[in-house]
């Protein structure tokens, strides 16, 4: 994928020398205090002894544990049908595990959609209010800088549109922008760029890598692309591996 050849590094700064993408003071204040960090507690997103079973009795996980440190970019790899999307929803607080716990910087994970963990799903149409314009959706999230929007390739005229007036890729960029505007400590991305062409996918991932590096944001992501994983991940977890 030649699109990756420009500015992507597995380690270090993805765009050295460019303007820095720090959270604005309002964004940092928005995130602060959402989750208290106990003195002496190591900062991390931690799933401990997670088990999950469907109502019919099918067990998806039994005692799964993982940790993600601030600034890490962790790829989750597993065959189709293993339950990667379910795990992403558990990590972001959208699903409650049958057993076990998810902790964020030493405290229980808050309700879904709140800082400090934001989910970027693979179906953006399921994560927006169809009655809102994109400007309205972003205004609810927090500070949205022009650098954030331009970095994701969002055109100004798109902001006045509703979800049904945008393509899937355009809508997904707004979902990514909203997640970042919430000033999360951790991002969970479930095949969130699979709908993009190669050039757009590379651009979005360069931006996400740069954001995470400069803000110390931990990233958990799912992808079936070995090349993308090789360029983005600082660590890979093979789910189901013994």
Placement of each model-derived feature along the sequence:
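The feature captures the beta-strand-to-loop junction immediately N-terminal to the Walker
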Residues: 77-79
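Conserved ABC ATPase signature
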Residues: 162-166, 170
């Amino acid at each position: 994928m030649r699109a990756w050849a420009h500015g992507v590094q597995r380690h270090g700064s993805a765009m050295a020398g460019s303007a820095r993408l720090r959270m604005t003071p309002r964004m940092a204040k928005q995130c602060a205090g959402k989750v208290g960090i106990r003195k002496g507690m190591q900062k991390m997103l931690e799933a401990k002894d997670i088990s999950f079973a469907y109502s019919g009795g099918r067990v998806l996980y039994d005692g799964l544990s993982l940790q993600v440190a601030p600034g890490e970019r962790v790829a989750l790899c597993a065959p189709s049908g293993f339950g990667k999307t379910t795990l992403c929803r558990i990590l972001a607080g959208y699903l409650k595990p049958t057993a076990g716990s998810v902790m964020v910087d030493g405290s229980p994970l808050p309700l879904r959609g709140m800082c400090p963990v934001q989910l970027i799903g693979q179906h953006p149409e399921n994560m927006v209010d169809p009655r809102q314009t994109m400007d309205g959706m972003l205004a609810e999230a927090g500070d949205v800088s022009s650098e954030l929007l331009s970095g994701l390739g969002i055109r100004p005229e798109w902001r006045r549109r509703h979800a049904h007036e945008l393509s899937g890729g355009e809508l997904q960029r707004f979902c990514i922008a909203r997640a970042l505007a919430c000033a999360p400590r951790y991002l969970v991305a479930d095949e969130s760029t699979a709908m993009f062409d190669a050039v757009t996918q590379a651009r979005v991932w360069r931006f996400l890598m740069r954001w995470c590096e400069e803000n110390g944001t931990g990233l958990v992501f799912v992808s079936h692309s070995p090349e993308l994983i090789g360029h983005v991940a600082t660590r890979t977890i093979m789910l189901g591996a013994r």
